[in-house]
Design a protein with these regions (language model features):
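Hydrophobic alpha-helical bundle signature of multipass membrane enzymes
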Residues: 12, 24-268, 341, 345-406
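Extracellular/surface-exposed low-complexity segments
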Residues: 295-363, 367, 385-438, 535-595, ...
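Alpha-helical transmembrane segments that form the membrane-embedded catalytic/substrate-binding core
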Residues: 233-237, 268-297
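Ser/Thr/Gly/Pro-rich low-complexity, disordered linker/stalk segments of secreted
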Residues: 589-617
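Sec-dependent signal peptide cleavage junction
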Residues: 14-25, 614-624, 643-646
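Extracellular beta-strand/loop-rich repeat segments of large surface/secreted proteins
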Residues: 441, 470-546
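Extracellular repeat-rich scaffold modules on cell surfaces
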Residues: 408-477
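C-terminal membrane-anchoring or membrane-association module
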Residues: 635-650
Length: 650
């Protein structure tokens, strides 16, 4: 066994396999919350008010106190002290570069994101459901896509819908609207933090930062009441986006991307710097978690989620999805977490998971418990050392986009139970991260979990029920794979490596989707076969004779698949063990042909197999001999079925 966290197998009988998992676990205290100077944000979030002006009392100031390593606020808007000239100069230089290279299209988007209610702006993150939401919520804006010609001299305000609001709480989607409003309007303002830090907007730091011409009328004439850090628009966008993401977790990452885009548009507009935008995101994340943890919001958040699932998502989406490109979303969101600043602080700090942060994932990863969600946040957090991000509680280092992709590491053994009858992510989910760590994965329940990362976890993999799909060649990391009762599916064009032993019990199924000669399952250790093998040939691929489908270093003597099915090939193809591989071929031995003839001439043989089947010869041992599986032909495409159980019981 290669697994660092060994899989210890106990064979109770030929059909019973009890795995005992032992991982070199990270101590459970690793995910314990650490308070800030103000306590825990989720406990004291209502202390964010204009009357509380210190970081020890006001959490909106305290959570951003990392900025004090770069800047000391002055007594006035323009007399603060720069502590880290390199970083603050870089901050303004980045803003200048973005404003000086923006396109007209980017300017127009920046204008719309400035002038529209941020709640309305976030609707586009719903993708194909955006228009359905606008109609169902009676959402509206008076800021049209066509920017008025006189916008360079006239400041336009968003008048909302016909009722003067962005959407109606009395509409068919009113619970969602009310949820967003509640989050936005509860101790969520950036005003206290702006007043405390007194850090100027970028255009006041440098003339190289240019404001979009249509937003010049929006420039405040009173710099003493117009701080840049943190960005209020960004804060509002993330609050609205996270609210919608909670209700519609199917759009979780797209909503995050949309919020990050609005934040970036604040830089494009010339109104904010990258650090301003980062600060807005950090604060909004803490506020959102606080609202989700507040028991007074329990019924409201439930109602919003249920309304989204039962009303909005049951409709056919008609809108164009502007955020359908996952790779682009990932690239943009990840960059905007740090805006390319280098790690100039302590890079050795362990990840800290804020108290209550797990609530941010409770609809996105509903099949995990609260503790497991904290481990997900722990394993997907940003490294330490980036400017502003290292707050005591850990809000700045959360990467919710990555967390929505499941674990980033198995720091201890992980057991996942998915009940497909509950639908949604309970029935099917993708874990796209590259999973490391010494822990093992055990999959239980009837749902399907898909692993698609370049995984290196070493604890091994156990499937007890349901389905586990490998969508990458290294999906199962390093270690033994055990299929006791479920379906392991291979769907990786480059083939699948099982870096250890593979053991399949009688109730297990291995299903392969083979689309090329390279699409092979390579078992580096010993194979022990039982149960069912299903081979689907796809993409019109027809293999040559003796093409390897499964390779292994050795085969457990006396083991074989009870049943084999081949789909997608002409009926003359058969599966066979040839040395240290299972291959497919149209060739048959003389012994095979003779025994085939005998099997169709006697009533006894017919009784032993399904009607119309042709039985293959008995196998020899796996030391290099060849054994053939019988074939049932269904039309043009063959289905090879070898039922070992019926022959043994004859």
């Amino acid at each position: 066994m290669k697994a660092t966290a060994a899989i210890l197998a106990v064979m109770v009988s030929s059909q019973t396999f009890i795995p005992v998992l032992a991982a070199d676990s990270v101590d459970a205290s690793a995910i314990d919350p650490v308070p800030g100077a103000y306590g825990y944000y989720v406990d004291v979030y209502t202390n964010n008010s204009s009357s509380n002006t210190t970081q020890e009392i006001n959490p909106s100031i305290g959570v951003l106190s990392g900025f004090l390593k770069l800047w000391t606020p002055g007594t006035e808007w323009n007399n603060g002290t720069i502590l880290d000239e390199a970083i603050l100069n870089e901050n303004i230089d980045k803003a200048a570069e973005i404003t000086n290279t923006r396109t007209q299209k980017e300017e127009d988007r920046a204008y719309l994101d400035d002038r529209r209610n941020q709640n309305y702006s976030m609707i586009s993150g719903l993708g194909v459901y955006a228009e359905n939401f606008i109609k169902g919520a009676n959402a509206g804006t008076t800021i049209s896509d066509t920017i008025p010609a006189d916008a360079t001299t006239v400041k336009y305000e968003d008048g909302g819908n016909s009722n003067g609001v962005w959407a109606d709480e009395t509409s068919s989607l009113g619970s969602i609207v009310k949820f967003v409003n509640t989050v936005r309007n509860s101790s969520a303002s950036t005003s206290s933090a702006k007043a405390f830090f007194k850090y100027m907007r970028p255009f006041r730091w440098s003339e190289d930062v240019s404001i979009v011409s249509t937003l010049i009328p929006c420039k405040s004439s009173d710099p003493s009441n117009d701080g840049g850090f943190p960005s209020g628009h960004t804060n509002a966008a993330y609050l609205a986006a996270l609210s919608l993401a909670y209700a519609v977790p199917e759009r979780y990452q797209e909503m995050l991307t949309r919020a990050s885009e609005l934040g970036n548009n604040r830089i494009v507009a010339g109104m904010h710097s990258p650090l301003d935008v980062i600060g807005g995101r950090i604060m909004a994340t803490a506020v959102m978690a606080s609202m989700l943890n507040d028991p007074t919001n329990a019924e409201l958040k439930k109602a919003a989620y249920e309304q989204a699932q039962n009303v909005l998502l049951t409709q056919t989406g008609t809108s164009t999805d502007q955020y359908s490109d996952y790779k682009t979303n990932l690239k943009n969101y990840t960059y905007r977490l740090t805006y390319g600043f280098e790690q100039t602080g302590d890079i050795t700090k362990a990840m800290v998971v804020p108290k209550g942060a797990e609530a941010l994932l409770e609809t996105r990863l509903p099949y995990l418990d609260a503790t497991q969600r904290r481990w997900v946040l722990y394993s997907t957090g940003l490294p330490s050392g980036y400017p502003v991000l290292d707050d005591a509680e850990g809000w700045g280092r959360l990467n919710l986009f990555a967390a929505a992709n499941g674990y980033g590491a198995f720091d201890n053994d992980v057991t996942v139970t998915m009940d497909a009858s509950q639908g949604g992510y309970h029935a099917l989910d993708y874990w796209k991260n590259d999973i490391s760590g010494s822990g093992a994965l055990t999959k239980k329940g009837t749902g399907t979990l898909i692993l698609s990362g370049n995984n290196t976890y070493t604890g091994g993999t156990v499937l007890e029920e349901g389905s586990l799909k490998a969508a990458s060649g290294t999906a199962f990391g390093q270690g033994d794979v055990i299929n006791s009762s479920g379906t392991i599916m291979e769907d990786a064009s480059e083939g699948l490596t099982i870096d250890g032993d593979y053991t399949q019990m009688e109730e297990g199924t291995l299903e392969l989707n083979i689309g090329s000669e390279e699409d092979v399952v390579n078992i580096t250790g010993q194979a022990s076969f039982d149960g069912t093998l299903v081979i689907n040939f796809i993409n019109d691929y027809v293999p040559a004779n003796d093409t390897e489908i499964i390779s292994f270093s050795s085969l457990d003597a006396g083991t074989e698949f009870s049943e084999v099915e081949i789909h997608g090939l002409p009926e003359e193809y058969k599966a066979q063990i040839n040395g240290e591989a299972l291959v497919v071929s149209t060739e048959a031995t003389a012994n095979d042909t003779a025994e085939d003839s005998d099997s169709t001439d006697t009533a006894e043989s017919t009784d032993e197999t399904e009607a119309g089947a042709t039985e293959s010869p008995a196998t020899r041992d796996s030391s290099g001999a060849v054994f053939y599986f019988a074939m049932l032909a269904f039309g043009i495409t063959g289905v090879v079925v070898y039922n070992r159980k019926s022959r043994k019981n004859a």
